[in-house]
């Protein structure tokens, strides 16, 4: 198995090649190191290699890692987010990638207003309309 540095170098090379093929600048793309279920020591090693954007899929795990890892990490919520957990991450995340309902968006807005912050989000759309998948239906989009 490749070590973390070799793996990161390979991913970076792949990103650079994809950017070149697409006529894009490397700076147009954000590499997010997905940290879910990984130990703190491993995340610190990855951080030491350069990445500053980390993705987490569980609020509690994200909050625990935020407490002990460097404060300049930009955290991304990449998993399903329950409305009762929004208050724990608003104002602490770079981007919420998985807003899958109007109800959730309204809760994010409510918590953001309480903290006087702006929250960047991505809306998750269930294009395939699969019942087992999260996301709003395409008819609900503007």
Model-predicted segments: where are they?
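Conserved alpha/beta-domain cores
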Residues: 1-142
């Amino acid at each position: 198995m490749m070590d973390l540095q070799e793996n990161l170098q390979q991913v970076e090379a792949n990103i650079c090649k994809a950017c070149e093929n697409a006529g894009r600048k490397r700076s147009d793309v954000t590499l997010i190191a997905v940290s879910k279920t990984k130990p703190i020591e491993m995340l610190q090693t990855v951080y030491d290699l350069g990445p500053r954007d980390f993705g987490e899929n569980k609020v509690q795990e994200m909050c625990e890692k935020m407490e002990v890892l460097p404060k300049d990490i930009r955290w991304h919520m990449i998993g399903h987010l329950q409305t009762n957990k929004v208050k724990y991450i608003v104002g602490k995340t770079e981007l919420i990638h998985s807003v899958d309902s109007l109800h959730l968006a309204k809760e994010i807005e409510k918590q953001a207003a309480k903290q006087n912050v702006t929250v960047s989000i991505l809306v998750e759309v269930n294009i395939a309309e699969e019942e087992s998948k999260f996301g709003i239906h395409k008819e609900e989009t503007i």
